[in-house]
């Protein structure tokens, strides 16, 4: 289904929990209110996924908090898989991944994004609050052993870890990572208080572009992508105040408390479907129909957060 700005709905991001075993200083917690910590049940997530497929959703990404803290994570993945979703991925800090990667693969998880914000032990602990670099690296290696494809690493660039970027690039090349996402720090949710650590990407991107054997713009989100001689693809993620990024947005978020959040940056553009998910007096079809109404409403209010910048640029052209 397409919104009034011509953007199709293709992705659903599901926040499984707000609990995390890391305390990264820049975490935006998916732009959600953190008062509600426990997420929806596997069955509830499955219901929303089932309706989402009817509206054109092809892929689901599991986020947090830290998704691997959910003991029922394999069950959640199976519920989503049976709903008809084509592609299931997850973003994780990787700390627990080495022990459960096989179970997640067997349950139907296709792809993994693993956060790696430093490759020196002291800096890793400074960024995440946890002395867990070795366990994260073990998780990355086990994900490769299990055959997840592609495996992507996420690196959030800040003033506190900018010197780590090249180390992470080299590590990604050495072990055969498919893609590395260099992500701009942006002021969303809890991340607003740490935006003073924002580090521009211009110089780093120029250095990467110089050695790249191929450069392109990702069609889905209009992000620059550079293929290095090693085969590693480096993608630049700069969503903040970026109307081009907003123009390519094709996702809706399902929050831990049962709301459809239409924009990471907006707290007012949400539709509550918790009644449909939690009312035991409703039949299955009644629940599904209410969730359908929720998606229809969400799509009707969905709009690019930075559309005002589109208007300014159009006037200046």
From Swiss-Prot:
Gene3D superfamilies noted in UniProt: Aldolase class I
List UniProt keywords, sorted A-Z. 4Fe-4S, GTP-binding, Iron, Iron-sulfur, Lyase, Metal-binding, Molybdenum cofactor biosynthesis, Nucleotide-binding, S-adenosyl-L-methionine
Q: What Enzyme Commission number(s) does the record list for this chain?
A: 4.1.99.22
Single GO molecular-function term?
GTP 3',8'-cyclase activity
Instruction: Report the cofactor remark.
Output: Binds 2 [4Fe-4S] clusters. Binds 1 [4Fe-4S] cluster coordinated with 3 cysteines and an exchangeable S-adenosyl-L-methionine and 1 [4Fe-4S] cluster coordinated with 3 cysteines and the GTP-derived substrate.
Which residues of this UniProt protein bind [4Fe-4S] cluster 2? 246, 249, 263
Residues given in the record as GTP binding sites? 13, 61, 91, 152, 251-253
Kindly give the PROSITE patterns that the UniProt entry links to this protein.
MOAA_NIFB_PQQE, RADICAL_SAM
What this chain does, per the record? Catalyzes the cyclization of GTP to (8S)-3',8-cyclo-7,8-dihydroguanosine 5'-triphosphate.
Member of which family?
Answer: Belongs to the radical SAM superfamily. MoaA family.
The name of this protein is Probable GTP 3',8-cyclase
Source organism of the structure:
Metallosphaera sedula (strain ATCC 51363 / DSM 5348 / JCM 9185 / NBRC 15509 / TH2)
């Amino acid at each position: 289904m397409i919104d009034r700005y011509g953007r199709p709905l293709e992705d659903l991001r599901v926040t499984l929990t707000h609990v995390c075993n890391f305390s990264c200083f820049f975490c935006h917690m998916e732009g959600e209110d953190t008062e509600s910590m426990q997420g929806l049940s596997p069955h509830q997530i499955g219901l929303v996924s089932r309706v989402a497929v009817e509206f054109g959703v092809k892929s689901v990404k599991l986020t947090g908090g830290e998704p691997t803290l959910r003991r029922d994570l394999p069950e959640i993945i199976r519920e989503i898989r049976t709903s008809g979703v084509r592609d299931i991925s997850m973003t994780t800090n990787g700390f627990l991944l080495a022990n459960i990667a096989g179970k997640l693969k067997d349950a139907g998880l296709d792809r993994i994004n693993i956060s790696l914000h430093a490759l020196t032990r002291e800096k890793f602990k400074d960024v995440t609050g946890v002395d867990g670099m070795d366990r994260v690296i073990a998780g990355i290696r086990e994900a490769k052993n299990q055959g997840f494809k592609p495996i992507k690493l996420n690196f959030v660039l800040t003033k506190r870890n900018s010197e780590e970027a090249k180390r992470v690039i080299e590590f990604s090349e050495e072990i055969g990572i498919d893609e590395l996402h260099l992500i701009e720090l942006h002021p969303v949710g809890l991340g607003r208080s740490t935006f003073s650590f924002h580090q521009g990407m211009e110089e780093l991107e120029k250095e990467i572009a110089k050695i790249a054997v191929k450069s392109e713009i990702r069609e889905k989100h209009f992000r620059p992508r550079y293929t290095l001689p090693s085969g590693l693809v480096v993608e630049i993620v700069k969503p903040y105040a970026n109307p081009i990024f907003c123009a390519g947005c094709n996702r809706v978020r399902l929050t831990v408390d049962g709301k459809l959040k239409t924009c990471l940056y907006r707290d007012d553009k949400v539709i509550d479907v918790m009644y449909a998910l939690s009312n035991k007096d409703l039949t299955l079809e009644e629940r599904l129909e209410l969730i359908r109404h929720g998606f229809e409403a969400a799509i009707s209010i969905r709009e690019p957060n930075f559309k005002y910048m589109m208007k300014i640029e159009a006037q200046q052209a």
